[in-house]
A protein has these predicted regions:
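Surface-exposed receptor/substrate recognition regions of extracellular proteins
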Residues: 1-68, 72-74
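A recurrent domain-boundary module in secreted/ectodomain proteins
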Residues: 39-45, 338-347
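Structural signature of tandem-repeat unit edges
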Residues: 60-74, 84-97, 107-120, 130-143, ...
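Consensus positions within tandem repeat domains that build extended binding/scaffold surfaces
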Residues: 77-79, 99-105, 122-128, 145-150, ...
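A structural signal for leucine-rich repeat
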Residues: 309-314, 335
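Acidic glycine-/aspartate-rich tracts in secreted/extracellular proteins
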Residues: 325-330, 336-337
Length: 347
């Protein structure tokens, strides 16, 4: 019988097939993490009808879990977390949500699909599931939590549900095989590090309603080929598009006031850029190692923006900065702009 945080088993297990856990909210995750072998017979953990039902269907002689079945509508927080040998889970179609850390760090879990009725994926739901091979997500999902698919290198999504409005921080970090060519039109924000190291990400546009892009959001996405940014973006944080050699931007949103450090570093696809009139600050090395950058047109700027260190380091040999003729001398004398005085031309 259950006692406190323990399940007490009889000394004889002959004919025994299951163990009943009376308080799944407090005991389920703790016990699932342990090997359940009763006298060498495959064991099971069963919760009351109102809670989740989890059954180990194949337990090796060592007691390590290889497969599991689940019954219930919500996968609780940490329900399957840290099951290093779990390879598959059979979830019914009526599952509607997977809680935070539901399958966190299940490195051998291989799922190709999720129940179609799921509307919510919690933070870290599938983080560090390196064998996960999902090709699509349930259509009812409207947001993706923080770290939800972090470090899932085999994730093979080609699209996201149309109702998604936000993507959390680190949501797809290191999803190196994920091929997305577009994002849902209703997205308004993309979190920090959301697509870091997504080597196959092949977006050419971003949804027009996006107003916020986090730091390192698209860092090291070598196939990203954007030609414009959404008009509602007013600032770009640190390293948002660093190491994106196929970026082909020429202009920036008119209301943009700041470009963060390293924002476009190594943007070798940039050839000519026009800075927006509202711009007040450019961070350190924002355009460093943009080897093909020949022109930075500042003629729309109404004042000299503050400039960080080495912003245009290693630009093209013929690089020049165009500024309003009335502000030419002020530009040449300004901190850090003075390093490029010979390349500043009033027009």
């Amino acid at each position: 019988m259950p006692s406190g945080n323990q399940v007490i088993l009889p000394t004889s297990s002959k004919g025994m097939r299951k163990v009943t856990i009376q308080k799944p909210d407090t005991l389920l995750s703790e016990n699932i993490k342990k090997d359940v072998v009763i006298g060498g017979v495959t064991g099971a953990l069963e919760a009351p009808p109102t809670g989740p039902y989890i059954e180990y269907t194949s337990i090796a002689s060592s007691g390590r879990v290889f497969t599991a079945k689940f019954r219930g509508t919500i996968v609780p927080e940490y329900a399957f977390a840290y099951l290093a040998e779990l390879t598959s889970v059979d979830m019914p179609d009526n599952v509607i949500a997977i809680g935070d850390n539901g399958f966190y760090r299940c490195p051998k879990l291989s799922l190709t699909s999720l129940p179609s009725g799921i509307t919510s994926l919690g933070d870290y739901a599938f983080a560090d599931c390196s064998m996960l091979t999902l090709t699509s997500l349930p259509s009812g999902i409207t947001s993706l939590g923080d770290y939800v698919f972090r470090d899932c290198p085999r994730l093979a999504l080609t699209s996201l549900p149309s109702g998604i409005t936000s993507i959390g921080q680190y949501a797809f970090r290191n999803c190196s095989k994920m091929v997305l060519t577009s994002l849902p039109s209703g997205i308004t924000s993309i979190g920090d590090f959301a697509f870091l190291n997504c080597y196959q990400l092949s977006l050419t546009t971003l949804p027009s309603g996006i107003t916020s892009i986090g730091q390192y959001a698209f860092n090291n996405c070598p196939r990203l080929a954007l030609t414009a940014l959404p008009s509602g973006i007013t600032s770009l944080p640190t390293a948002a598009f660093q190491y994106c050699p196929k970026l082909a931007l020429t202009t920036f949103p008119s209301g943009m006031t700041s470009i963060g450090a390293y924002a476009f570093k190594q943007g070798t696809g940039l050839a000519s850029i026009t800075l927006p009139p509202a711009l007040t600050a450019i961070g350190n090395q924002a355009f460093a190692n943009c080897y093909n950058l020949k022109v930075c047109d500042c003629t729309e700027c109404t004042a000299v923006p503050t400039l960080g260190a080495s912003v245009f380091q290693n630009a093209h040999a013929d690089f020049k900065i165009l500024v309003p003729s009335a502000l030419e001398e002020e530009w040449k004398a300004a901190a850090n702009w003075s390093s490029y005085a010979s390349q500043i031309i009033g027009v």
